[in-house]
Amino acid sequence: MKLVIVSGRSGSGKSVALRVLEDLGYYCVDNLPLPLIGSLLEQLKGSNDLVAISVDVRNLPEQDKVLVKQLASLPEGTELTSFFLNSSDKVLLKRYSETRRLHPLSKSRVSLQEAIKLEGKLLEPLSQQMDHYIDTSNLNIYELSDQVRQILLGSVDKELVINFESFGFKHGMPTEADFMFDVRFLPNPHWEPELRPLTGLDEPVAEFLNRQPLVNKFIWQIENLLETWLPHLERNNRSYLTIAIGCTGGQHRSVYVAEQLAKRFSNGKHKVNARHRELNHAKA
């Protein structure tokens, strides 16, 4: 089992680091009480081999000793990596002023500036126990994400999952699509009596559509568009990209086009999924 502990001052980027870990498949728990680390790992044993927890000032004071004790008693075979994120007082003050969020220690009559300084003092012992110290003062969220991935994977490369989804316009448009293409102008197998009961997954329908120059040209143009912009989308720190293909009923044309695109992109470095909304609904 791999355990990652993320700690640091409020506003330094712990939530960004946790999102990166979540994208990498980690089961993430924010601000877990330190005495519960052992029981959490025990519960997840066998079902989740990647676990990440965040530890912040709300777990303190004096629980740094508890953390040492908990880490010393981790289950055998647990691979531990820990991060401490920090920023200068000036940067933290600016971030809190911009977001207008309440600092965890901004209670009673303690000013924001005093709360930031107090938190730094309280977390100092904990920061010295962490494996990796990252100063995020001059980092944006993408640069911080890259640093976390670099430490964990030895590379900043991020696997982008591409989902091709077919649907029927008469059943409503999908809300989660990043790109949407309307293929209702393509030749329709529905008007061929022998093809009407079939779907775009069936060979006779695939052969019919493959004979249509317009279909092949449109697929090629979508493929070319996506290949042109995928590198830029990846640099934008995306985890998923959903391309929706719609025809009238979501049975023939959209299914075929989505399948063809999925096959073409499966030959590359990305993880690719093809799903067919209306066909899945028909099975349910």
From Swiss-Prot:
Q: Which InterPro entries match?
A: P-loop_NTPase, RapZ-like, RapZ-like_N, RapZ_C
Q: What keyword terms does UniProt attach to this protein?
A: ATP-binding, GTP-binding, Nucleotide-binding
Its source organism is Shewanella sp. (strain MR-7)
- UniProt cross-references to NCBIfam families, sorted A to Z: PRK05416.1
Cite the binding residues for GTP: D56, V57, R58, N59
What this chain does, per the entry, is described as:
Displays ATPase and GTPase activities.
HAMAP family registered for this protein in UniProt: RapZ_like
List positions binding ATP.
G8, R9, S10, G11, S12, G13, K14, S15
> Which GO MF terms are attached to this record?
ATP binding; GTP binding
Which family is annotated?
Answer: Belongs to the RapZ-like family.
Q: What is this protein called?
A: Nucleotide-binding protein Shewmr7_3352
